[in-house]
Regions:
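Substrate-recognition/specificity elements adjacent to catalytic centers across diverse enzyme folds
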Residues: 120-381, 386, 728
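Hydrophobic alpha-helical segments
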Residues: 439, 531-630, 726
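Second-shell loop/turn segments in exported
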Residues: 40, 72-74, 147, 193-209, ...
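Terminal end segments
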Residues: 609-679, 771-894
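Cellulosome-associated attachment modules in secreted, modular CAZymes
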Residues: 14-121
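Bacterial N-terminal signal peptides that target proteins for export
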Residues: 2-13
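Charged, long alpha-helical assembly modules
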Residues: 706-796
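Glycine- and hydrophobic-rich flexible loops that cap the catalytic core of alpha/beta enzyme folds
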Residues: 403-414, 422-427, 431-568
Length: 894
C-alpha cells in the first residue's frame, strides 16, 4: 500500500508523525481469545492502537495475526473507521470497542490466528458504607452482575420474590384467591414462557452475560440460605415456602411488568371510560353531549406548561372545533359498561388489589436540569426525583457498579439487572412518567380472535385454574375473560401496545444508557427505550438535554384517540408502523429544562387520559415558576437546585400522583373579586387569611415542612373552597350513571373552571357554559354568586379557627406486619439524586432513599427482627437531608 499524503487529513498526519517518532510496536504472538480494539496487541486499548492502525493502513506495516483485534467496530473489515474509532474512544468520548471488550473473549466476526496477551480480569470486590449501600468493583461483566444480584438478594430477597410472583402471575398461590384476578390480568397481558425465552435470545451477548450473572448471584444467596436458613427472611417462614431458583423467564417477565406500571397508558381503561362517558352524556344531555365531551377530553391546550421551552407564543383563541368527531361505533356498543367494568378488573382493579396488601405502585416524578451558564460553578446540575410510592421496604436500592467497562451508580429495582436512574463519569439522567400514546383498545369481532395458549395459575392448596389466553392481530383479549368462544357475543376488547416485543430489549437499552459516552449515544438509547418517560440529562461536555421516550405510532386520519378503535380495519396503525417524531431538545436558550409529569412540548398530548389534564394549571408550575424567578436573580448554586425539591413537595397535599402546585394563585383574583362584591366579616377574614398565605400546605418554613403535624389553615381553606366550587359547577352536568364529577379528576375540572371564569383570556375556550344550573335544585348560575356560595359552605363546614387539621402521613406498610414506619406527608420522590457534572465528570453527588438499604426481616423466636439497615436512612430521608455519595474518583470510605 502506498502513502498519498495529499489525501490524509491533518489529524491523521499528526498521529502518523507521532508513530514514526515513537517507533513501531509489535508483540509476540499467542493463542486467542483477544481484546477487540487492541491493534498493537499489548493487552490494552489506548491511543497507541489508533496510531498503529494508521501506520498499518497508510505506511504498509505488517498486519499481525489477529485481524479481529484490529477490527474495532466489528464490521469484518480493518479500515480507517477502526483507527478513527480508537482515537475517538480515547479522546472524544466516542463509542467503546465492540464485544469482546474490555477483557478477552471470543467473537463470531473477524479472524484471529494468535494473540499475545490477555490482561488479567480483576477480582470482584464488594464494600458497603455505613448505611449498607454496596460498591461493587472488578470482574468480568458476568462476575460484576453476579455480585450485583447477590448483594440485592442479601438485602431484598423477599421483595424480589414478591415482584417475581407479581410479574409471573403467581400471587394467589401465597396470598389466596383474592389475588387470583391479579394473576389472571398479568397472564392475559404477558408473554408466554417461550416468548420470554425468545426475547432473551434476541438481546446482545453482553446483555445475556449480565442477566445470567445477576441470576447466578440471586441463586448463590438462595443456596446459602438452603444450607443455613438462619437469615431466611421472615416472610418466607410466614407464608410457609422456600424460594425457588431464579430463571431467565423471571427476569424477562419482571422487566416487562414492572416497567409497564410506569407507562401512563399501558395499564388503563381510559378509552373505554371515555366511551362510557360520551354514551352517558348523550343519555343525559343529548343536545350538548359532544360539546361537553370535547371540553372534558381536550387534546391540546397551548397554555399548558411544557418540558421543552416554548419558542413561539400561540396566537389567538382555540376552541374544540379541531377535535376529531367520534364514529358512532367507537362508543355506541352493546354491553359497553360491562366491557369497561371487566377491563377495569384487569387494569385498575389490579392496582386496587395490590393496594390492599400494602404494595401499591404509583406514578409521578419531578426533575430539572440547569445548564452551566446559569450556575455559579459553570457546570450543569441535574435533580432527579422519581415518585414510585412508599412501601416497606422501599421499591428501590442504591449502589455502584465499576468493572468490565461499566461505571455507574444510582437507583436499582430488586430483580432488575440495571441502574434505572443514575450517573456515570460522563453523564447523569432522570426519569418521569410521560404521556406517549402507546395503547389503543380495539373492539374486535369474536371471529377475529383465536386461542393463543392455556396458562395454569396455582391458587394454593393444590388448586389450579386453567386460563385460556386469546389474542387477535391487535393483541391480547382483555374483556371479557374468554373461556370459550362458543356462544360468545362480541365485540371483545383487545389491547394493542406500541412497545409489544420491543420491551423485551429493555436490559440492552438500559445498558446502552449506562455505557453511552456522549449525548448522541444516549439519544440513540432513547430511540429504543420502550417506556413512556420524560428523561433529563447532563454531561461533562456541558450539554443538557431532554427526551420523551416511548413509541407513539402514527394513526390513520379520523380515528379518535380518546375512544376505543374499531377492529374492522378502518382504524389500523399505518403499515408499516411508523412513529411520531420524538419530542426532544438540547441546550435550550432558556438554559434549563424541567417539569413534574407535565406536557412534553407543543401539540396534542394526553387526551385519552383524564389524569393528565394538561391545561393552564399544572403542578409543574410550582417548579417552573421558582426556577424562572431564581434565574432572573443570578447564578444558581448546588443547594438551590437541590432544595427546590423540598419547596415543591410542600406546595400541596395529599395524593402523590395528582396533587402539587398552588391552584389558589390561578383563581385568587376572580374569587377575591366575587367576595369583595358581597363582603361580610367572615368572608373578609377568609380573604385576609389567604392574602397572607405563603403558598405551602404547612406553615413555618423548611423545618416545619418536614416535621409539623398540622396543615396550614390558609391551605385548608383554599383547598376546600376550590373543591366546593368544582362540585357546585359540575355536579349537575356530570351526574351520569357511572361517571360522576368526582371521577373526572380535580385538575381536569379545575382547568375547565379556569376557562369559564369571567374575563378568562385563555387560549383554549370551553364549548358550553358549565355554570348553567341543569339540576332541579336551586343554586346560582352566576359564577361570582356561586363562588361566594361555595365560600359560605366551606366556612360553615370548617367552624371557628384555628382549624389545625391533622397533617397526613406517609405510612410504610410491610407484608404481614402492617405499618412499620410513618413520617409527615410531603409530595416527594421515592428516590432523589442531585448531580453536578464538571468537565472531568461528576464533581458532587447527593442522594437519598426511603427507610433503608436492607429490606430483610428475620425470624427471632416468634417475633420478626429487622435488619440493622432496614431503617438506616430514616433520619436522612424524613429530614429531606440528601447525603453525599462518592464521585467516581473516590471510594465509599473517602
Amino acid at each position: 500500500m502506498s502513502l498519498n499524503l495529499s489525501k490524509i487529513s491533518p489529524l491523521i498526519l499528526l498521529f502518523t508523525a507521532v508513530m514514526l517518532l515513537s517507533g513501531s510496536v509489535f508483540s509476540s504472538a499467542a493463542d486467542i481469545p483477544f481484546v477487540r480494539g487492541d491493534a498493537n496487541t499489548d493487552g490494552v486499548v489506548n491511543l497507541s492502537d489508533g496510531i498503529w492502525l494508521l501506520q498499518y493502513l497508510f505506511l504498509s506495516t505488517p498486519e499481525g495475526e489477529c485481524a479481529a483485534a484490529r477490527d474495532f467496530n466489528s464490521d469484518g473489515q480493518v479500515d480507517l473507521a477502526d483507527a478513527l474509532g480508537v482515537i475517538s474512544f480515547r479522546l472524544l468520548d466516542g463509542a467503546p470497542p465492540a464485544h469482546p471488550y474490555p477483557y478477552c473473549g471470543d467473537s463470531s466476526i473477524g479472524e484471529c490466528a494468535s494473540y499475545p496477551i490477555c490482561p488479567p480480569v480483576p477480582d470482584v470486590q464488594v464494600n458497603r458504607d455505613e448505611l449498607g449501600v454496596w460498591f461493587i468493583e472488578g470482574g468480568s461483566i458476568f462476575d460484576l452482575y453476579e455480585a450485583f444480584g447477590y448483594e440485592v438478594a442479601v438485602d431484598r430477597l423477599w421483595q424480589a420474590e414478591y415482584f417475581r410472583r407479581l410479574c409471573r402471575g403467581r400471587l394467589a398461590e401465597i396470598y389466596g384467591v383474592d389475588q387470583a384476578q391479579t394473576d389472571i390480568s398479568i397472564r392475559l397481558l404477558g408473554y408466554s414462557d417461550e416468548e420470554y425465552l425468545a426475547g432473551f435470545e434476541n438481546i446482545s451477548e453482553r446483555a445475556k452475560e449480565l442477566v445470567l450473572g445477576y441470576i447466578a448471584g440471586f441463586n448463590r444467596r438462595i443456596e446459602e440460605l438452603g444450607a443455613d436458613p438462619t437469615d431466611l427472611p421472615f416472610e418466607f417462614t410466614d407464608f410457609g415456602f422456600f424460594p425457588e431458583p431464579w430463571t431467565v423467564v423471571d427476569v424477562m417477565a419482571l422487566q416487562v411488568t414492572l416497567l409497564r406500571n410506569f407507562d401512563s397508558e399501558a395499564l388503563s381503561t381510559h378509552q373505554l371510560d371515555n366511551a362510557v362517558l360520551l354514551a352517558e352524556l348523550e343519555d343525559e344531555h343529548p343536545q350538548d353531549a359532544l360539546a361537553m365531551f370535547d371540553d372534558l377530553r381536550w387534546l391540546d391546550d397551548p397554555d399548558a406548561p411544557t418540558m421543552i421551552p416554548p419558542t413561539t407564543p400561540f396566537q389567538g383563541l382555540q376552541s374544540a372545533q379541531g377535535l376529531p368527531t367520534p364514529v358512532a361505533g367507537q362508543y355506541q356498543v352493546e354491553n359497553l359498561r360491562l366491557l369497561r367494568d371487566r377491563a377495569h378488573e384487569v387494569f385498575e382493579g389490579t392496582r386496587d388489589r395490590l393496594q390492599g396488601i400494602g404494595t401499591p405502585l404509583r406514578m409521578g416524578s419531578y426533575a430539572w436540569v440547569v445548564g452551566g451558564d446559569l450556575t455559579d460553578s459553570g457546570n450543569p446540575i441535574i435533580y432527579a426525583g422519581p415518585q414510585m410510592g412508599f412501601t416497606a421496604p422501599a421499591i428501590i436500592v442504591e449502589g455502584s457498579l465499576r468493572g468490565a467497562g461499566i461505571d455507574v451508580s444510582g437507583m436499582a429495582v430488586p430483580g432488575l439487572p440495571g441502574m434505572i436512574i443514575g450517573r456515570t463519569p460522563r453523564h447523569a439522567w432522570s426519569g418521569q412518567v410521560a404521556h406517549a400514546h402507546t395503547v389503543d383498545l380495539y373492539l374486535d369481532a369474536v371471529e377475529d380472535i383465536s386461542l393463543h395458549r392455556i396458562e395454569t395459575i396455582p391458587l394454593g392448596k393444590d388448586q389450579f385454574f386453567n386460563l385460556p389466553v386469546y389474542r387477535s392481530v391487535h393483541g391480547p383479549v382483555i374483556s371479557p375473560i374468554v373461556i370459550s368462544t362458543e356462544n360468545l357475543e362480541g365485540p371483545v376488547v383487545t389491547w394493542k401496545y406500541s412497545h409489544w416485543g420491543n420491551e423485551l430489549r429493555t436490559v440492552d437499552v438500559n445498558l446502552d444508557m449506562v455505557m453511552a459516552r456522549n449525548l448522541q449515544e444516549f439519544s440513540s438509547a432513547m430511540d429504543e427505550f420502550s417506556v413512556s418517560l420524560h428523561v433529563c440529562y447532563a454531561d461533562r461536555r456541558q450539554n443538557i438535554a431532554y427526551w420523551m421516550a416511548g413509541l407513539d405510532p402514527v394513526r390513520v386520519p379520523g380515528a379518535d384517540p380518546r375512544l376505543p378503535q374499531l377492529g374492522d380495519g378502518s382504524m389500523e396503525w399505518t403499515q408499516p408502523v411508523t412513529y411520531k417524531p420524538r419530542k426532544t431538545v438540547t441546550n435550550p436558550s432558556r438554559g434549563w429544562i424541567g417539569g413534574w409529569n407535565n406536557k412534553a412540548g407543543s401539540g396534542e398530548a394526553g387526551g385519552a387520559n383524564p389524569n393528565h389534564a394538561y391545561g393552564k394549571f399544572h403542578r409543574a408550575h410550582a417548579m417552573q415558576d421558582r426556577l424562572t424567578s431564581a434565574v432572573a436573580e443570578g447564578p444558581l448554586d448546588f443547594e438551590f437546585v437541590r432544595d427546590l425539591a423540598l419547596e415543591v413537595s410542600a406546595t400541596d397535599c395529599c395524593d402523590l400522583g395528582k396533587n402539587g402546585g398552588n391552584k389558589w394563585f390561578f383563581v385568587s383574583e376572580s374569587f377575591t373579586e366575587a367576595v369583595e362584591a358581597d363582603l361580610t366579616p367572615e368572608r373578609l377574614e377568609a380573604l385576609q387569611l389567604l392574602e397572607s398565605w405563603d403558598g405551602y400546605f404547612v406553615e413555618g418554613g423548611e423545618e416545619a415542612w418536614v416535621s409539623s403535624t398540622v396543615n396550614s389553615d390558609a391551605w385548608e381553606l383554599q383547598d376546600r373552597w376550590i373543591r366546593r366550587v368544582l362540585e357546585l359547577v359540575f355536579e349537575d352536568e356530570l351526574e351520569t350513571e357511572t361517571l360522576t364529577w368526582r371521577r373526572q379528576g380535580e385538575n381536569l375540572l379545575f382547568n375547565i373552571l379556569l376557562r369559564g371564569l369571567p374575563g378568562s383570556d385563555l387560549t383554549l375556550q370551553n364549548s358550553i357554559n358549565w355554570f348553567e344550573n341543569r339540576s332541579s335544585v336551586a343554586k346560582p348560575s352566576d359564577p361570582f354568586e356561586l363562588i361566594v356560595w361555595a365560600l359560605d359552605d366551606t366556612l360553615a363546614s370548617l367552624g371557628p379557627r384555628p382549624w389545625d387539621m391533622d397533617r397526613a402521613t406517609i405510612d410504610y406498610q410491610a407484608d404481614s406486619l402492617g405499618v412499620v414506619w410513618s413520617a409527615p406527608w410531603l409530595d416527594r420522590s421515592t428516590y432523589a439524586q442531585v448531580v453536578e457534572v464538571g468537565p472531568e465528570g461528576p464533581t458532587r453527588i447527593e442522594s437519598m432513599i426511603p427507610l433503608g438499604q436492607s429490606g430483610a426481616i428475620y425470624v427471632n423466636g416468634q417475633d420478626p427482627e429487622f435488619d440493622p439497615q432496614y431503617f438506616g436512612f430514616t433520619e436522612i430521608f424524613d429530614g429531606f437531608l440528601h447525603r453525599d455519595f462518592p464521585v467516581f474518583h473516590e471510594s465509599p470510605q473517602d
